[in-house]
Design a protein with these regions (language model features):
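Conserved functional micro-motifs across diverse proteins
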Residues: 1-146
Length: 146
């Protein structure tokens, strides 16, 4: 498992055409790789993100992340076709957690989206630790320094 947070506004803007950190959303780029001989069911996996203060960041569904982006940018009136197009493009980046990792499907790549504890903009978070539970073995990864 490899994980990298997108911490800069520029990266977020370029990739998603939206400033996710300003909306209080931290996108985590993930890669899950199949390395065992037995298929690994990942749809029951639980992803938890905590900062150095012990506060838990909320995992957002793509739909919730989109609503948060729209709300944070005060977008209340929009062309329905434009929103559908944005949703389609945004969800194309989401990691597939529904299909198991197996010999025929060895890699899953994409993003998970976490909201800051107070819905405030993401500003150089310290001591971020990602914990993945309900896998054959739990995984803990330090993402940022304390």
């Amino acid at each position: 498992m490899r994980v990298a947070p997108l911490l800069s506004d520029e990266e977020s803007q370029e990739l998603f055409e939206a400033n996710l950190p300003l909306a209080g959303i931290l996108p985590l780029r993930m890669e899950l790789a199949f390395e065992s001989g037995v298929p690994v069911e990942i749809k029951k996996a639980r992803f938890r993100l905590r900062d150095s203060s012990g506060r838990e960041w909320k995992l957002l569904s793509p739909k919730s992340a989109i609503s948060r982006i729209m709300s944070a940018n005060d977008v209340y009136a929009y062309n329905p076709h434009s929103r559908k197009q944005f949703e389609k493009e945004f969800t194309a980046y989401v990691i597939d957690l529904k299909s198991p990792l197996s010999d025929s499907d060895r890699h899953h790549r994409g993003f998970l989206f976490f909201q800051t504890p107070e819905k405030s903009p993401v500003e150089s978070p310290r001591g971020l630790v990602l914990t993945v539970e309900k896998l054959p073995q739990p995984v803990t990864i330090q993402l940022t320094d304390n």
